[in-house]
Amino acid sequence: VGVDYTSDSQIGTTLDAGRRFGDNDQFGARVNLVHREGETGVPNDRRRTTLLSTGLDYKGDNFRTSLDLGYQKKTFHGSPTSVNISAVDFVPEPPKNDRNFSQKWAYSDIENEFGMWRSEYDITDSWTAYTGLGAQHAHEEGIYSAPKLLDKSGNATVSRLDTNRISDSVSGMAGIRGNFDTGFVSHKVNVGYSAMTKNEKIAWKMSATADNPTTNIYHNTGVAMPDSSNFNGSGGKYSDPLTSGRTRTQGWLLSDTLGVLDDKLLFTAGARHQKVVIRGYNKITGAENDADGFDGSRWMPTYGVVYKPW
Protein backbone atom coordinates (compact mmCIF):
# COMPACT_ATOMS: atom_id res chain seq x y z
CA VAL A 1 0.00 0.00 0.00
CA GLY A 2 1.30 3.45 -0.88
CA VAL A 3 0.26 7.08 -0.54
CA ASP A 4 1.64 9.95 -2.63
CA TYR A 5 1.28 13.73 -2.76
CA THR A 6 2.10 15.85 -5.82
CA SER A 7 2.00 19.57 -6.67
CA ASP A 8 -0.56 21.73 -4.86
CA SER A 9 -3.17 19.22 -3.77
CA GLN A 10 -2.97 16.02 -5.81
CA ILE A 11 -3.23 13.04 -3.49
CA GLY A 12 -3.09 9.39 -4.51
CA THR A 13 -3.10 5.91 -3.10
CA THR A 14 -1.92 2.59 -4.52
CA LEU A 15 -2.36 -1.06 -3.69
CA ASP A 16 -0.26 -3.93 -5.05
CA ALA A 17 -1.11 -7.41 -3.77
CA GLY A 18 -0.11 -10.80 -5.13
CA ARG A 19 0.76 -14.34 -4.19
CA ARG A 20 1.27 -17.82 -5.60
CA PHE A 21 -0.79 -20.95 -4.89
CA GLY A 22 -0.59 -24.70 -5.38
CA ASP A 23 1.74 -27.47 -4.30
CA ASN A 24 4.49 -26.12 -6.55
CA ASP A 25 3.34 -22.48 -6.64
CA GLN A 26 2.05 -23.09 -10.15
CA PHE A 27 -0.86 -20.64 -9.80
CA GLY A 28 -0.36 -16.90 -9.39
CA ALA A 29 -2.62 -13.89 -8.85
CA ARG A 30 -1.90 -10.18 -8.60
CA VAL A 31 -4.08 -7.09 -8.17
CA ASN A 32 -3.11 -3.44 -8.66
CA LEU A 33 -5.26 -0.47 -7.64
CA VAL A 34 -4.47 3.22 -8.19
CA HIS A 35 -6.52 6.31 -7.47
CA ARG A 36 -5.14 9.83 -7.65
CA GLU A 37 -6.85 13.21 -7.92
CA GLY A 38 -6.49 16.89 -7.16
CA GLU A 39 -5.06 20.12 -8.55
CA THR A 40 -1.67 20.21 -10.23
CA GLY A 41 0.91 22.99 -10.05
CA VAL A 42 -1.06 24.86 -12.73
CA PRO A 43 -4.05 26.78 -11.27
CA ASN A 44 -7.50 25.30 -12.02
CA ASP A 45 -5.94 22.20 -13.62
CA ARG A 46 -7.62 19.29 -11.85
CA ARG A 47 -6.94 15.68 -12.79
CA ARG A 48 -8.20 12.30 -11.63
CA THR A 49 -6.85 8.83 -12.43
CA THR A 50 -8.36 5.48 -11.50
CA LEU A 51 -6.77 2.15 -12.44
CA LEU A 52 -7.63 -1.45 -11.66
CA SER A 53 -5.69 -4.38 -13.10
CA THR A 54 -5.67 -8.10 -12.38
CA GLY A 55 -3.15 -10.72 -13.47
CA LEU A 56 -3.58 -14.49 -13.32
CA ASP A 57 -1.05 -17.08 -14.44
CA TYR A 58 -0.28 -20.79 -14.40
CA LYS A 59 3.19 -22.32 -14.77
CA GLY A 60 3.25 -26.08 -15.23
CA ASP A 61 5.93 -28.49 -16.37
CA ASN A 62 5.33 -27.95 -20.09
CA PHE A 63 2.41 -25.51 -20.22
CA ARG A 64 2.30 -21.85 -19.22
CA THR A 65 -0.56 -19.38 -19.54
CA SER A 66 -1.42 -15.91 -18.26
CA LEU A 67 -4.40 -13.54 -18.34
CA ASP A 68 -4.26 -9.81 -17.61
CA LEU A 69 -7.36 -7.60 -17.37
CA GLY A 70 -7.49 -3.88 -16.69
CA TYR A 71 -9.62 -0.77 -16.46
CA GLN A 72 -8.41 2.82 -16.47
CA LYS A 73 -10.20 6.17 -16.40
CA LYS A 74 -8.49 9.55 -16.63
CA THR A 75 -10.39 12.82 -16.17
CA PHE A 76 -9.04 16.30 -16.90
CA HIS A 77 -10.77 19.54 -15.88
CA GLY A 78 -9.32 22.85 -17.05
CA SER A 79 -6.08 21.25 -18.22
CA PRO A 80 -3.98 23.21 -20.76
CA THR A 81 -3.93 21.61 -24.21
CA SER A 82 -2.41 23.67 -27.03
CA VAL A 83 -2.38 27.15 -28.57
CA ASN A 84 -3.56 27.51 -32.17
CA ILE A 85 -1.12 29.77 -34.09
CA SER A 86 -2.58 29.27 -37.58
CA ALA A 87 -3.78 32.91 -37.73
CA VAL A 88 -0.33 34.46 -37.13
CA ASP A 89 3.05 34.30 -38.86
CA PHE A 90 5.26 34.07 -35.77
CA VAL A 91 6.02 31.72 -32.90
CA PRO A 92 4.79 33.33 -29.66
CA GLU A 93 6.62 33.51 -26.35
CA PRO A 94 5.29 30.57 -24.33
CA PRO A 95 3.24 31.37 -21.21
CA LYS A 96 4.86 30.74 -17.83
CA ASN A 97 4.45 27.16 -16.72
CA ASP A 98 2.34 28.23 -13.73
CA ARG A 99 -0.20 30.03 -15.95
CA ASN A 100 -3.29 28.24 -17.23
CA PHE A 101 -4.53 29.45 -20.62
CA SER A 102 -7.33 26.87 -20.69
CA GLN A 103 -10.87 27.36 -19.35
CA LYS A 104 -12.48 25.90 -16.23
CA TRP A 105 -15.36 24.46 -18.27
CA ALA A 106 -13.06 22.42 -20.50
CA TYR A 107 -12.82 18.74 -19.63
CA SER A 108 -11.92 15.33 -21.01
CA ASP A 109 -12.94 11.83 -19.88
CA ILE A 110 -10.88 8.92 -21.24
CA GLU A 111 -11.78 5.32 -20.39
CA ASN A 112 -9.91 2.16 -21.36
CA GLU A 113 -10.74 -1.50 -20.80
CA PHE A 114 -8.18 -4.05 -21.95
CA GLY A 115 -7.30 -7.71 -21.73
CA MET A 116 -4.32 -9.86 -22.75
CA TRP A 117 -3.98 -13.64 -22.82
CA ARG A 118 -0.86 -15.64 -23.66
CA SER A 119 -0.01 -19.36 -23.60
CA GLU A 120 2.99 -21.56 -24.35
CA TYR A 121 3.23 -25.33 -24.68
CA ASP A 122 6.47 -27.29 -24.85
CA ILE A 123 5.93 -29.92 -27.55
CA THR A 124 9.38 -31.36 -26.87
CA ASP A 125 12.45 -30.17 -25.01
CA SER A 126 13.46 -28.29 -28.16
CA TRP A 127 10.17 -27.01 -29.61
CA THR A 128 7.54 -24.68 -28.13
CA ALA A 129 4.22 -23.52 -29.56
CA TYR A 130 2.90 -20.13 -28.47
CA THR A 131 -0.20 -18.02 -28.94
CA GLY A 132 -1.59 -14.75 -27.65
CA LEU A 133 -4.69 -12.59 -27.89
CA GLY A 134 -5.37 -9.01 -26.84
CA ALA A 135 -8.29 -6.57 -26.98
CA GLN A 136 -8.94 -2.97 -25.99
CA HIS A 137 -11.96 -0.67 -25.85
CA ALA A 138 -11.34 3.08 -25.51
CA HIS A 139 -13.83 5.93 -25.16
CA GLU A 140 -12.93 9.62 -25.10
CA GLU A 141 -15.49 12.37 -24.60
CA GLY A 142 -14.78 15.97 -23.81
CA ILE A 143 -15.20 19.68 -24.36
CA TYR A 144 -11.96 21.38 -25.40
CA SER A 145 -10.99 25.07 -25.40
CA ALA A 146 -7.83 25.69 -27.38
CA PRO A 147 -7.15 29.46 -27.73
CA LYS A 148 -6.46 30.81 -31.24
CA LEU A 149 -3.73 33.44 -31.04
CA LEU A 150 -4.39 36.85 -32.65
CA ASP A 151 -1.29 38.95 -31.88
CA LYS A 152 2.04 39.08 -30.06
CA SER A 153 0.38 40.49 -26.94
CA GLY A 154 -1.26 37.11 -26.37
CA ASN A 155 -4.82 38.05 -27.25
CA ALA A 156 -6.75 35.08 -28.55
CA THR A 157 -10.24 33.79 -29.25
CA VAL A 158 -11.59 30.76 -27.42
CA SER A 159 -13.49 28.14 -29.39
CA ARG A 160 -15.46 25.20 -28.07
CA LEU A 161 -14.88 21.76 -29.54
CA ASP A 162 -17.00 18.81 -28.39
CA THR A 163 -15.53 15.40 -29.22
CA ASN A 164 -16.85 11.85 -28.90
CA ARG A 165 -14.43 9.09 -29.95
CA ILE A 166 -14.67 5.30 -29.60
CA SER A 167 -11.91 2.85 -30.52
CA ASP A 168 -11.94 -0.96 -30.47
CA SER A 169 -8.90 -3.10 -31.20
CA VAL A 170 -8.23 -6.85 -31.30
CA SER A 171 -4.85 -8.45 -31.96
CA GLY A 172 -3.51 -11.97 -31.94
CA MET A 173 -0.44 -14.04 -32.68
CA ALA A 174 0.60 -17.67 -32.94
CA GLY A 175 3.75 -19.51 -33.81
CA ILE A 176 6.34 -22.12 -33.04
CA ARG A 177 9.99 -21.78 -32.07
CA GLY A 178 12.69 -24.34 -31.57
CA ASN A 179 16.33 -25.25 -31.86
CA PHE A 180 18.32 -28.01 -33.57
CA ASP A 181 21.80 -28.68 -34.94
CA THR A 182 23.09 -29.47 -38.43
CA GLY A 183 26.62 -30.70 -37.95
CA PHE A 184 28.65 -28.03 -36.16
CA VAL A 185 25.99 -25.33 -36.81
CA SER A 186 23.24 -24.64 -34.27
CA HIS A 187 19.86 -23.24 -35.30
CA LYS A 188 17.24 -21.26 -33.39
CA VAL A 189 14.13 -21.02 -35.56
CA ASN A 190 10.93 -19.02 -35.14
CA VAL A 191 7.86 -19.18 -37.41
CA GLY A 192 4.88 -17.01 -36.54
CA TYR A 193 1.77 -15.16 -37.62
CA SER A 194 0.21 -12.00 -36.18
CA ALA A 195 -2.86 -9.92 -37.01
CA MET A 196 -4.61 -6.81 -35.73
CA THR A 197 -7.90 -5.07 -36.46
CA LYS A 198 -8.92 -1.62 -35.25
CA ASN A 199 -12.27 0.14 -35.59
CA GLU A 200 -12.56 3.91 -35.01
CA LYS A 201 -15.73 5.94 -34.42
CA ILE A 202 -15.58 9.70 -34.00
CA ALA A 203 -17.91 12.69 -34.05
CA TRP A 204 -17.37 16.34 -33.19
CA LYS A 205 -19.04 19.75 -33.19
CA MET A 206 -17.57 23.25 -32.94
CA SER A 207 -18.84 26.63 -31.80
CA ALA A 208 -19.58 29.39 -34.31
CA THR A 209 -16.68 31.80 -34.82
CA ALA A 210 -18.87 34.83 -34.10
CA ASP A 211 -19.70 33.42 -30.66
CA ASN A 212 -16.12 32.77 -29.60
CA PRO A 213 -15.09 35.05 -26.69
CA THR A 214 -11.63 36.59 -26.36
CA THR A 215 -8.96 35.90 -23.77
CA ASN A 216 -5.22 36.30 -23.29
CA ILE A 217 -2.84 33.36 -23.03
CA TYR A 218 -0.57 35.28 -20.62
CA HIS A 219 -3.35 36.73 -18.40
CA ASN A 220 -6.33 34.40 -18.61
CA THR A 221 -9.29 35.66 -16.58
CA GLY A 222 -11.74 32.98 -17.73
CA VAL A 223 -14.62 33.33 -20.19
CA ALA A 224 -18.10 31.88 -20.50
CA MET A 225 -18.53 28.67 -22.47
CA PRO A 226 -19.92 29.27 -26.00
CA ASP A 227 -23.56 28.25 -26.38
CA SER A 228 -24.05 24.76 -27.80
CA SER A 229 -27.20 25.86 -29.66
CA ASN A 230 -25.18 27.74 -32.26
CA PHE A 231 -22.52 25.40 -33.61
CA ASN A 232 -21.29 26.21 -37.12
CA GLY A 233 -19.45 22.98 -37.78
CA SER A 234 -19.96 19.32 -37.01
CA GLY A 235 -18.64 15.97 -38.07
CA GLY A 236 -20.78 12.90 -37.59
CA LYS A 237 -23.61 11.89 -35.28
CA TYR A 238 -22.40 13.08 -31.91
CA SER A 239 -24.63 10.94 -29.67
CA ASP A 240 -23.96 7.77 -31.69
CA PRO A 241 -20.81 8.10 -33.84
CA LEU A 242 -20.55 6.04 -37.01
CA THR A 243 -17.43 4.15 -38.03
CA SER A 244 -14.89 6.59 -39.45
CA GLY A 245 -12.03 4.19 -40.12
CA ARG A 246 -10.92 0.57 -40.05
CA THR A 247 -7.41 -0.81 -40.06
CA ARG A 248 -6.36 -4.44 -40.54
CA THR A 249 -2.82 -5.76 -40.49
CA GLN A 250 -1.40 -9.26 -40.74
CA GLY A 251 2.07 -10.65 -41.07
CA TRP A 252 4.02 -13.89 -41.42
CA LEU A 253 7.55 -14.20 -40.11
CA LEU A 254 10.39 -16.70 -40.38
CA SER A 255 13.80 -16.37 -38.77
CA ASP A 256 16.82 -18.58 -38.15
CA THR A 257 19.77 -17.74 -35.95
CA LEU A 258 22.78 -19.86 -36.91
CA GLY A 259 25.61 -20.32 -34.42
CA VAL A 260 29.15 -21.65 -34.76
CA LEU A 261 32.20 -21.79 -32.50
CA ASP A 262 30.03 -22.79 -29.52
CA ASP A 263 27.60 -19.97 -30.44
CA LYS A 264 30.27 -17.30 -30.09
CA LEU A 265 29.52 -16.27 -33.68
CA LEU A 266 25.83 -15.84 -34.50
CA PHE A 267 24.19 -14.94 -37.79
CA THR A 268 20.47 -14.19 -37.99
CA ALA A 269 18.50 -14.22 -41.23
CA GLY A 270 14.77 -13.69 -41.42
CA ALA A 271 11.89 -12.36 -43.46
CA ARG A 272 8.46 -10.94 -42.72
CA HIS A 273 5.52 -10.44 -45.05
CA GLN A 274 3.32 -7.59 -43.82
CA LYS A 275 -0.09 -6.62 -45.23
CA VAL A 276 -1.97 -3.43 -44.31
CA VAL A 277 -5.57 -2.60 -45.24
CA ILE A 278 -7.06 0.80 -44.32
CA ARG A 279 -10.62 1.94 -44.99
CA GLY A 280 -12.13 5.38 -44.35
CA TYR A 281 -15.82 6.22 -44.03
CA ASN A 282 -17.99 9.33 -44.13
CA LYS A 283 -18.77 10.35 -40.54
CA ILE A 284 -22.32 11.45 -41.43
CA THR A 285 -23.54 8.85 -43.94
CA GLY A 286 -21.26 5.92 -43.12
CA ALA A 287 -20.40 5.47 -46.80
CA GLU A 288 -16.88 4.33 -47.65
CA ASN A 289 -14.47 6.98 -48.95
CA ASP A 290 -12.34 5.38 -51.65
CA ALA A 291 -9.80 8.22 -51.44
CA ASP A 292 -9.07 7.36 -47.80
CA GLY A 293 -8.36 3.69 -48.47
CA PHE A 294 -5.06 1.87 -48.67
CA ASP A 295 -4.21 -1.73 -49.47
CA GLY A 296 -0.61 -2.87 -49.64
CA SER A 297 1.85 -5.57 -48.67
CA ARG A 298 5.61 -5.98 -48.60
CA TRP A 299 8.37 -8.44 -47.79
CA MET A 300 10.89 -7.16 -45.24
CA PRO A 301 14.24 -8.92 -44.79
CA THR A 302 16.12 -9.03 -41.50
CA TYR A 303 19.73 -9.96 -40.87
CA GLY A 304 22.37 -9.47 -38.22
CA VAL A 305 25.73 -10.70 -36.96
CA VAL A 306 26.86 -11.05 -33.34
CA TYR A 307 30.32 -12.06 -32.16
CA LYS A 308 30.94 -12.86 -28.48
CA PRO A 309 34.71 -13.07 -27.80
CA TRP A 310 34.21 -13.93 -24.10
Give, region by region, the residue ranges found by the protein language model:
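Transmembrane beta-barrel strands of outer-membrane/channel proteins
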Residues: 1-5, 15, 31-35, 67-73, ...
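Residues that define the transmembrane beta-barrel architecture of outer-membrane proteins
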Residues: 4, 9-13, 46-50, 111-113, ...
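Transmembrane beta-barrel wall of Gram-negative outer-membrane proteins
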Residues: 7-81, 105-125
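Surface-exposed loop/turn segments flanking beta-strands in extracellular/periplasmic regions
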Residues: 84-99, 150-156, 203-241, 288-293
